[in-house]
Amino acid sequence: MYKRQQEYTGCNVGDFRLSCLTVADSRGAFGADFTYVSHTVEAGKYQLTGLPCAHAEENDAETLIVRMQDETTGLTLELLYGVFAQQDVITRAARLTNHGDAPLRLDKAASACLDLPFGRWDLLHFHGRHAMERQLEREAVGTNIQTISSVRGSSSHHNNPFLILCQQDATETSGACYGVMMVYSGSYQMDVERSQTGLVRVVSGIQEERFAWNLKPGE
């Protein structure tokens, strides 16, 4: 499992890299193993009620919804992809619903996961302070975990919720680059990990350090 590229990782399923989700049942047992159920393609861009998100007219974007389920807990996962073909942008979100009979505790619930192809990558991000926002830093992605985050209750100038992963020989005019940005104004966390096999993973979402959510049946 740890050698495979994943779209969204559960927990305690043999993938020892960064996970997107940490969920415990009423006994305190951790685990979530999602399997494919169905998918649909819809015109327009999905909406996130009560949350900031990108918007588009029906003809300007498409939405892919992939539905998955964990048989043990009854937890269902919807992966939402908003495709802006003309802008070369894909937006991501994840929706969790408890269809089981008992409450579940979420200790981590990321919005998206991105596994990159093999290769040597650099991480570009922007840090700052008062009157010195958006200071560029470029560093090699090593065999470890690098974190960009904020626990201020807002994204803040401390660390911008945005990063670029680029080939180490990439310049302003050539080379492969992947940009990841949180459309979110609260505390956030973006983790980058290069595994022992050379795969690079990005997990992006709400800050897990001060996050816990009791998900009741039907929610």
Identify the meaning behind each predicted range.
Residues 3-202, 207-213:
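Polysaccharide-binding surfaces and accessory modules of carbohydrate-active proteins
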